[in-house]
Regions:
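Short acidic-glycine-tyrosine-enriched beta hairpin
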Residues: 62-76
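Generic protein-terminus/edge-of-domain signal
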Residues: 1-65, 85, 108, 112-115
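A short, Lys/Arg-enriched amphipathic alpha-helix from helix-turn-helix/homeodomain DNA-binding modules
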Residues: 121-133, 146-147, 163-178
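Ligand-binding loop in jelly-roll beta-barrel domains
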Residues: 43, 77-100
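Short, solvent-exposed positions on alpha-helices
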Residues: 140-148
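A short, acidic/glycine-rich surface segment
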Residues: 30-37, 80-81, 102, 164
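Hydrophobic recognition helices of helix-based DNA-binding modules
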Residues: 135, 154-157, 161
């Protein structure tokens, strides 16, 4: 398994704070046949998974998450998901907490349901990679920048989801021809 992870050392899940990014990472299976995660009692924070390549399996209710899908897990919810080497998955994940967490997910239509298709965009990967780097290096202001990048990620996913649901919005990007 190859991974790049960043942890907000000293950041404890404090739901009373507005938004705190606790950890973020990127998995790619190289040799391990199956990476299986089971958390019977869940975690005390929120989690968002994004399938950047191939697929992940979220049994029993979630089914298979394919490229371009995101899966959200609320606090204390049981978790059971796995990735298989033969499917060559590439997954980004982030754990977060705070008073605004649920509201941000709901605002962009990413709260209800276990998973939803948000498409493939380089912007998502850049947001994840920047958050990972900030958590690894921890320069001054890293927590605030991580929260801002995460909000950008959610906004981008929510906006893309709206475009996919409503074809009339697909052309709402500004196009400049020279």
């Amino acid at each position: 398994t190859w991974s790049a992870c960043g942890y907000g050392d000293g950041c404890s899940p404090e739901p009373e704070k507005e938004l705190t990014i606790l950890s973020c990472g990127h998995y790619r299976l190289l040799r391990l046949e199956k990476l299986h995660t089971v958390r019977i009692q869940g975690r005390r924070d929120w989690q968002l998974l994004y399938v950047a390549k191939a697929r992940a399996t979220f049994p029993p209710a979630g089914g298979a998450g394919k490229t371009g899908e995101r899966c959200g897990v609320s606090p204390w919810r049981a978790q059971d998901y796995f990735y298989l080497l033969k499917e060559a998955p590439e997954i980004y994940w982030i754990h977060f907490t705070g008073e605004r967490a649920e509201g941000l997910l709901e605002e962009w239509g990413l709260f209800h349901g276990h998973s939803c298709f948000v498409g493939e965009q380089d912007r998502y990967l850049r947001c994840f990679e920047e958050i990972i780097q900030e958590l690894q290096l921890q320069p001054p202001g890293f927590q605030r920048l991580c929260a801002l990048r995460f909000e950008e990620l959610l906004l981008s996913m929510g906006r893309q989801r709206l475009r996919l649901k409503n074809p009339q919005l697909a052309g709402d990007s500004l196009v400049i021809q020279v």
